[in-house]
Design a protein with these regions (language model features):
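C-terminal outer-membrane/trafficking sorting elements
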Residues: 386-457
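Conserved hydrophobic beta-strand positions in leucine-rich repeat
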Residues: 94-96, 117-121, 138-142, 159-163, ...
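Right-handed parallel beta-helix
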Residues: 93-145, 154, 162
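N-terminal capping/linker segments that flank leucine-rich repeat
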Residues: 2-8, 12-118, 283-383
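Leucine-rich repeat domain C-terminal region
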Residues: 224-226, 230, 247-257, 263-311, ...
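Canonical leucine-rich repeat
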Residues: 94, 108, 129, 150-152, ...
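Leucine-rich repeat
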Residues: 90, 112-116, 133-138, 146, ...
Length: 457
């Protein structure tokens, strides 16, 4: 029996010695003569040896068994060709992050460190990494690198993935059902991000990409947070978020015109700088904290003529009760009744202006105020022809006494005559080529089939 145990110890000793001849982790680093630090955690108490590039193995101090917090920093100076080798068994935590101005890690091989649970390699120059042997990995943080692709299909225990600020265009997380936190911001992700196969994912940060669609699916996570700021989304469906009352959703800086929300009031909804209008914004009660102002400007034509009508009637209603005002580009207010009129959301321009815009405000959406006011794009109001002008349809308008005469009408032409206060004097469809309207002295807007002109009696 004694001989058996002696033999067993010899075998174990031989195996350990053999294991130590093969590095568990290898990395290629830039050589700048400065000290750099590696952070290591072991599954059981022990030591590691590190060859910093000169062929000599330096034994670390005793490293306690890793409990999630007690990893040990090991420092040295990279030399030679920058090939650093880490020897040791049961390495469960490893970090080789670099400083912004310091020397970087160029490549990293962890295929033999199969016990790894926590790997961090931020702010380096990694273009690829093989994780196919790291099936125990639970946390991967590898932001600020140059990765163009990554395969995490074998990392089925992964709960946290941070690959922020790389060059990635796509990622497959269908095999990562344990994933709770996903950080993929500042990449080049395009097309659709499908999260429907990960119903328990709790936090997703995918800001500053080129995503055109996101599929949430039925999300059952408690207190979920989703950030898709600064993408190219035009619509969004959040109806599958079960814990809506505690959900946070950021969609700022997209191209949204439509959003579907849970029936339950959300905790936070941010949709600033999208293409919503007063008519398409969600109700102000959809979230406890709802930030929607400013929005992208409402796009109108680049130019109008005096007498033309800008129809913004879609942006008002009995509920909205929208207030309209016109300003020059220097923010000087124009005078209603002199420079323009407003009637049911239709603005008629009365004077030529080099550059103006229209503001729209509603008590229902009170955050549209100050620099965050909802407004149109800029436009130019060009001078119109005189009283006896011939319109584009060949219609001639003239005045005499208290009568406005219109000739050259076609059967069925829609004719409206209104004063500058918006009061309609006449409204009819032509049944002959000539029409006459009696009115008191003053300024009027004559509109024919939507084209208008200012005249004076």
């Amino acid at each position: 029996m004694k001989k058996f145990f002696t033999l067993l110890l010899a075998v174990i000793s031989t195996m350990t010695a053999f294991a130590q001849t093969e590095p568990a982790i290898e990395l290629q680093a830039e050589v700048d003569g400065n000290t750099r630090t590696l952070t290591i955690g072991l599954g059981v108490e022990g030591t590691v040896q590190i060859d910093w590039g000169n062929g000599e193995k330096v034994t670390s101090e005793v490293i306690p068994a890793f409990d999630g917090w007690n990893q040990v920093n090991v420092s040295g100076t990279v030399s030679g060709e920058g090939k650093v080798k880490i020897y040791g068994d049961n390495i469960v935590c490893f970090e080789c992050s670099s400083t912004v101005k310091g020397a970087k890690v160029l490549s990293l091989d962890v295929t033999k460190a199969t016990a790894l649970k926590d790997l961090t390699a931020n702010t380096n120059k990694l273009t690829a990494i093989d994780l196919t042997k790291n099936t125990e990995l639970e946390k991967l943080t590898i932001s600020n690198n140059q990765l163009t692709s990554i395969d995490i299909s074998k990392c089925t225990k992964l709960t946290t993935l941070d690959i922020t600020n790389n060059l990635l265009t796509a990622i497959d997380i269908t095999k990562n059902q344990a994933l709770q936190t996903l950080r993929i911001g500042l990449n080049k992700f395009a097309g659709e991000l499908d999260l429907s196969t990960n119903p328990t994912i709790k936090s997703v940060y995918a800001q500053i990409n080129e995503l055109t669609a996101v599929k949430i699916g039925n999300n059952t996570a408690s207190k979920p947070t989703f950030s898709f700021n600064e993408n190219k989304l035009t619509s969004f469906d959040a109806t599958g978020i079960e814990d809506a009352a505690n959900a946070i959703l950021y969609l700022n800086g997209n191209q949204l015109t439509e959003i579907k929300l849970p029936s339950t009031k959300m905790k936070t909804l941010n949709i600033l700088k999208n293409n919503f209008t007063l008519a398409t914004l969600p109700a102000p009660t959809v979230a406890k904290t709802f930030n929607y102002a400013p929005q992208n400007n409402y796009v109108i034509a680049e130019s109008y003529k005096v007498g033309d009508v800008l129809d913004l009637s879609s942006q008002t209603s009995a509920t909205l009760n929208t207030q309209f005002a016109v300003y020059k580009s220097d923010k000087t207010a124009l005078t209603e009744g002199t420079d323009y009129t407003v009637a049911d959301g239709k603005i008629t321009f009365l004077t030529a202006q080099e550059a103006v815009y229209v503001t729209m405000s509603s008590a229902l959406y009170s955050k549209f105020t100050g620099t965050s006011i909802y407004k149109t794009t800029g436009t130019k109001v060009e001078g119109s022809t005189d009283i006896n002008a011939v319109t584009a349809q060949g219609v001639k308008i003239s005045t005499a006494g208290n009568e406005i005469s219109i000739s050259g009408l076609s059967q069925g032409d829609a004719v409206t005559v209104a004063n500058l206060g918006g009061a309609v004097v006449a409204n009819f469809h032509a049944n002959s080529s000539n029409a006459h309207v009696q009115a008191a002295k003053g300024l009027y807007i004559v509109s024919i089939n939507g084209k208008a002109i200012k005249i004076a009696l």
